[in-house]
Amino acid sequence: MTIAKMIDHTALKPDTTKEQILTLTKEAREYGFASVCVNPTWVKLSAEQLAGAESVVCTVIGFPLGANTPEVKAFEVKDAIQNGAKEVDMVINIGALKDKDDELVERDIRAVVDVAKGKALVKVIIETCLLTDEEKVRACEIAVKAGTDFVKTSTGFSTGGATAEDIALMRKTVGPNIGVKASGGVRTKEDVEKMIEAGATRIGASAGVAIVSGEKPAKPDNY
């Protein structure tokens, strides 16, 4: 598998414009990225632009705080799928995890998984920078129990992004059959190779073109 096919080509900034989405989808076609990862408002346009392409549309749910109710997250998924999303990256209820309310954390994830089943792949963002190692392990275990397809490190909108150490811990926790996505601060081919070596099977990056072309990203980006 090429590096491009492991990258979710990402544009999640709040000031993203239509022109930027059109560029993003054009680049996805050109380079063969796994997906474009966009905010829900851009799912329909992205799906139209990628009709017939190998790249699919990924969107974010309960993003970036994860503090919506399970019912709201479930509706977001339903709406996203209707608009053409084939993958959804949801943020867990981080406060509930901190409170050791594992039942709520699981119910929250399961609400998304149940709606997406058979229609969209689910990635669960645990926001590693806010968690202890014990919490990272527990979050991954709950996500697997709830039926996720992937666990993912970060939103790119908090205090830190992906590290090789966190990827290795997540991979060890979920085993070989669940995907692990590294996101947040992955900007170069070397960064990607480090994450893959640690156990990542998907990369979230706004610097996708720079990564596959070997050029330096135009400017640093958290995502």
From Swiss-Prot:
Keywords noted in UniProt: Cytoplasm, Lyase, Schiff base
Active site, UniProt feature: D89 (proton donor/acceptor), K152 (schiff-base intermediate with acetaldehyde), K181 (proton donor/acceptor)
Record-given protein name: Deoxyribose-phosphate aldolase
Family the entry assigns: Belongs to the DeoC/FbaB aldolase family. DeoC type 1 subfamily.
Organism placement in taxonomy: Bacteria, Bacillati, Bacillota, Bacilli, Bacillales
Chain segments annotated as transmembrane: none
GO terms for biological process, alphabetical: 2-deoxyribose 1-phosphate catabolic process; carbohydrate catabolic process; deoxyribonucleotide catabolic process
One Gene Ontology molecular-function label: deoxyribose-phosphate aldolase activity
